[in-house]
Amino acid sequence: MTEQYSVAVGEAANEHETAPRRNIRVKDQPLIRPINSSASTLYEFALECFTKGGKRDGMAWRDIIDIHETKKTIVKRVDGKDKPIEKTWLYYELTPYITMTYEEMICVMHDIGRGLIKIGVKPNGENKFHIFASTSHKWMKTFLGCMSQGIPVVTAYDTLGESGLIHSMVETDSVAIFTDNQLLSKLAVPLKTAKNVKFVIHNEPIDPSDKRQNGKLYKAAKDAVDKIKEVRPDIKIYSFDEIIEIGKKAKDEVELHFPKPEDPACIMYTSGSTGTPKGVVLTHYNIVAGIGGVGHNVIGWIGPTDRIIAFLPLAHIFELTFEFEAFYWNGILGYANVKTLTPTSTRNCQGDLMEFKPTVMVGVAAVWETVRKGILAKINELPGWSQTLFWTVYALKERNIPCSGLLSGLIFKRIREATGGNLRFILNGGSAISIDAQKFLSNLLCPMLIGYGLTEGVANACVLEPEHFDYGIAGDLVGTITAKLVDVEDLGYFAKNNQGELLFKGAPICSEYYKNPEETAAAFTDDGWFRTGDIAEWTPKGQVKIIDRKKNLVKTLNGEYIALEKLESIYRSNPYVQNICVYADENKVKPVGIVVPNLGHLSKLAIELGIMVPGEDVESYIHEKKLQDAVCKDMLSTAKSQGLNGIELLCGIVFFEEEWTPENGLVTSAQKLKRRDILAAVKPDVERVYKENT
């Protein structure tokens, strides 16, 4: 009999659902907190971890010494004519990593909490505190300070637009907001509406002696503060350092106000890929349990000697949970930035990966595909004999042939050094990744674990346990969750086939969306099961495999369904594809791929096809049909090699000239596609492709 990693706990309620299942190690009782912890609130948990960590370094970060500007002129084809366009590239000069011990983190947590109370923020849930900032040590310290006073935190992505920011600030009646200096300019308009906000705290001093980027950082922040004061002269503005100093001086007069397990710790707004963001109310009980669930699946594998690098948005539950896991492991958490992970955008210093040398790295599919394609580009630049040697050793490693470990250590050494040289585990979460990408990075760098979860469950659902390592699955149920599958009859998924919509129960699951009873009612069954909206199946070993989201399954003209996210994860693994949105018209048989091309690989192809000569800018030739057809042909080869066929094969592609970023509103901060907006931008081109292939 096949070994089982989850077991049924009870009988199926009816023929339209499977029996509920749990991780086999918690079959009798799911966890409600981390193993070996007695904490019931996030404050208790942080204090417990920091006390245990003592004089060990718990947190590390880099400060910006300067930002260097370089202007370049590129030629771009506009309306059929070549037009010179000037672009500015920014390069960051950073300090080495600065560290703080766990003991010092206790002091800072309390100082910030007392500082907030002293300036007028009320404790014990009476006021809410908004964080609108990029991931940094100051983001986390501010969050911890709020926890020490029972102040619920409202999170918003640093890329959130004005309407979303106003919605989250007004709906929650937040009285204070922490932000980055460079985001202050985004506050003036929202603060006209959000009259409830009385305090603004910015992450760095606004100092006229700050000459970084030729004084632009100071001037931009100063102008933004002046604008805020103009529209809201009643608002009090402080720097992060000022709050700490105020808190230190108030040590003997401001008490700590401890939260209760059932108190809201965080109202986390979903990224809003299809509409107005919903505020997920997560209690201290929920989040502490969530940390326990994820930690359960890797216990004994990650610990105090590990170095965990942090760069994903902290406004995303995936990152917030894993940073608290780092405290639980008593490792050191090193803050980084997507722009400076590699030396590509740094000056006079190493990139964050080479400087910090992490052993554990958490990322999303878009990050890992970028890493993979960057490695492939470097391999393709090698002489022919070197490429042959590389792929020969890779094939040996993939087949676990004796001595392949020694050979791969020598051949892959330089590639591994680009990520710091010490990685033991990498983790993908947030969205699906192709099996090809998981295999490639697992063999080249270290094992890639897979995580799956939702904001509503504190990222708890599945984490692939290292001893159960496999490809193409979402992983093992975490230690806090009970799960079952229910029929989705109209899509052809039935529990009798071990397929259906995935439903959860457990301590991490939230109980409501903030001030949104309609969405809350729709998300839960009458008997309290949370509907994930994801279609899944039980594997023969009792692990979970995600097929797609219900809303991303589209019925085509012949009546069959295609799974958009599944297709995107596979086509995205093609070297010519940086990102892709698969669009399926219900009145057509096959889908169209809307593709953001990988310009480096595309440039090489254009030269090989004789479309351009070396030195020219491939962006000028992006609409050449010969180039698009060649890329589409290669993408179809990728699809067929990974098992796609029939209606899953694209009938054609459209190139999208602009990268999809949260700033231009084409993806969320969690890198989820805003499908309607992407399609709207290229609808005539998509219709042309369909017409040509009908």
Curated annotation (Swiss-Prot):
GO terms for biological process: long-chain fatty acid import into cell; long-chain fatty acid metabolic process; long-chain fatty-acyl-CoA metabolic process; sphingoid long-chain base transport. CDD domains: LC_FACS_euk1. Its cofactor is Mg(2+). One of its GO terms (molecular function) is long-chain fatty acid-CoA ligase activity. GO terms for cellular component: cytoplasm; cytoplasmic stress granule; endoplasmic reticulum; lipid droplet; plasma membrane. ATP binds at residues 269-280. It is found in: Lipid droplet. It catalyses: a long-chain fatty acid + ATP + CoA = a long-chain fatty acyl-CoA + AMP + diphosphate; (9Z)-hexadecenoate + ATP + CoA = (9Z)-hexadecenoyl-CoA + AMP + diphosphate; (9Z)-octadecenoate + ATP + CoA = (9Z)-octadecenoyl-CoA + AMP + diphosphate; hexadecanoate + ATP + CoA = hexadecanoyl-CoA + AMP + diphosphate. PROSITE patterns: AMP_BINDING. Its EC number is 6.2.1.3. Its main location: other. Present with 31200 molecules/cell in log phase SD medium. Interacts with FAT1. PANTHER family: ACYL-COA SYNTHETASE LONG-CHAIN, ISOFORM J (PTHR43272:SF83), LONG-CHAIN-FATTY-ACID--COA LIGASE (PTHR43272). Belongs to the ATP-dependent AMP-binding enzyme family. This is Long-chain-fatty-acid--CoA ligase 4. The lineage of its organism: Eukaryota, Fungi, Dikarya, Ascomycota, Saccharomycotina. The gene is FAA4.
